Amino acid sequence: MITVRDLRAERGDTTVLEGLSLRIADGEFLVIAGANGSGKTTLVRQFNGLLDPESGSVSVDGVDVAEGPVAARTSVGMVFQNPRDCFVGAVVGADVAFGPENLGLDREEIDRRVGAALEAVGMADHRGTRIDRLSGGQQARVAIAGALAMEPDHLVLDEPFTGLDHPARRSVRRRLEALSAEGTSVIVVTHDLREVSDLADRIVVISGGTVALETDSPADERLAEFGVRPC
């Protein structure tokens, strides 16, 4: 479970989040929506200690992220909106293997995870390809594969479908749905509910620095009040 309590966060001199509280259950498929600049990305980067709050707290499975950032980064997989922020290797297979290698797994298990992750995003044939030779959409899929290979308890994806073609979107959607069914928390940050509306257990809208709306219906007409188009 991820628990956010009375969170306050700043970007420069601007307060982005103020008094935000949120609880995300194991296995929940949560969509975080809101206008550009509302603080969605600032919020999710608190989940594994990439950003520190000014006040309040974030805990992952009962451990305060500020006190155990390494544990949080192991438990919370993160896929950034710009996939280039994720890459640490020049070749697809080496990049996806980086996370599992740092978990101290044996080579057989690492190879299994890398193969399964690349298969899930339709990139199994590109294991030996240099990342800089891939299209933007292919790079996005490699970034998702890198997070999947960690087999985290909680997976955060910031605009994960940007640049993906329809077959890749279907493949990624199927994998995310399966992960949620298996007990992994899946948190998707998006401006387009149509991508995941049928998968979401709950939709949270961030506005005014806090949770302005929670709903389990993508057709909820109140979404439009916050610049989110109902489905």
Model-derived segments and spans:
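Conserved ABC ATPase "signature" region
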Residues: 107-126
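ABC ATPase C-loop
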Residues: 147-149
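A short, surface-exposed alpha-helical micro-motif characterized by mixed small hydrophobic
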Residues: 196-198
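H-loop/switch region of ABC-family ATPase nucleotide-binding domains
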Residues: 190-191
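Helix-to-loop junction immediately C-terminal to a conserved catalytic motif
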Residues: 48
